[in-house]
A protein has these predicted regions:
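Structured extracytoplasmic
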Residues: 25-186, 193-199, 204-223, 231-236, ...
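Bacterial N-terminal signal peptides
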Residues: 9-21
């Protein structure tokens, strides 16, 4: 997860969406077409979907998963596991190549050092909690920050979804700098209507968006973010794809240039009561299992 502070806090919230862990067990779809009743209210559907996302974030679940993150500097792949004390992560590949023995040793040493550094571990946990709280505030704002227009239905990855176009609500008064980014953004939402779950958010800045009357910084027109969600295991929904393209300025001189694509896969359920240390051990066991399989040529 990319984290920024101060003038770029709104961007940090958008980035945090991919790892917010918006997952919830919901009944599997029966394959029926989306049911759109006469007098369908797009705003109300968004409100229901947002309520489900917030509820899902408070759910009792944990997953292990893999994230491939691509930036202009290259590609890094990490294995993650949710624990009751935060999300633990371990680097497993660079530029789609397995780590060298030296790199593996360095990564193991980093994890061990983190476990033995209580102050750093608490700082990491505090940061993750603050990121999650910012995400929740932003998600709660969606029904009021935009006006929504029904554009039809479509099928995406086997899901029948409703497409809603959104544009800023002129009556919306952003309660903080974080929400100011919504005043210059339009795009579309895809919502699975039976379960009222957000399947995709695609937003683009149609104008420069300033923070603190432009004194603290701004994001440039044309910036875009995409977040894709879907059921991944036993009906659980979570983020599977995220794409970010933003430029701007912070505090007059510091440039903001974020070009990131993340794809998450290999989801599986793990116990919800794992400690951070147990999560790290699980990551190590997973890594050792992959190495053993590779050394045996994939034979069981």
């Amino acid at each position: 997860m990319i984290r920024k502070s101060g003038p770029a806090c709104a961007l940090a919230v958008l980035l945090a969406l991919v790892l917010a862990g918006l997952a919830q067990q919901t009944p599997p779809s029966n394959g029926a077409s989306p049911s759109i009743a006469p007098g369908f209210n797009p705003q109300e559907l968004v409100r229901r979907a947002v309520a489900n996302e917030v509820k899902a974030d408070e759910g009792d679940f944990s997953l292990m998963f893999r994230v491939r993150r691509q930036t202009p500097k290259g590609v890094q792949t990490r294995q993650y596991v949710d624990t009751k004390e935060g999300t633990a992560g371990m680097l497993v590949a660079i530029n789609d190549q397995p780590l060298t023995p030296q790199q593996r040793q360095q990564e193991m040493a980093r994890l061990d050092q983190l476990l033995n550094n209580l102050a750093e571990l608490r700082r990491k946990q505090k940061q993750q909690k603050e990121d999650s709280e910012r995400v929740t505030r932003m998600v709660r704002t969606l029904p009021d920050a935009f006006r929504y227009q029904y554009e039809g239905t479509e099928e995406v990855n086997g899901l029948k979804v409703v497409r809603l176009r959104f544009e800023p609500n002129p009556d919306f008064d952003p309660p903080s700098r974080e929400q100011q980014v919504f005043t210059g953004m339009d795009g579309f939402l895809l919502i699975e209507p039976q379960q009222a779950r957000i399947a995709r958010i695609d937003g683009t800045l149609f104008k420069d968006v300033g923070f603190g009357w432009g004194i603290l910084g701004h994001l440039d027109r044309g910036g875009r973010f995409i977040v894709v969600q879907g059921p991944v295991t036993n009906g659980y929904w979570t983020t599977t794809h995220m794409q970010l393209s933003f430029t701007g300025k912070a505090l007059f001189f510091k440039s903001i240039n974020i070009q990131t694509t993340e794809d998450s896969s290999a989801f599986r359920r793990v116990p919800a009561d794992l400690t951070y240390a147990q999560g790290v051990e699980l990551l190590k066991k997973q890594r050792n299992g992959v190495l053993a399989e590779n050394e045996n040529g994939g034979r069981k």
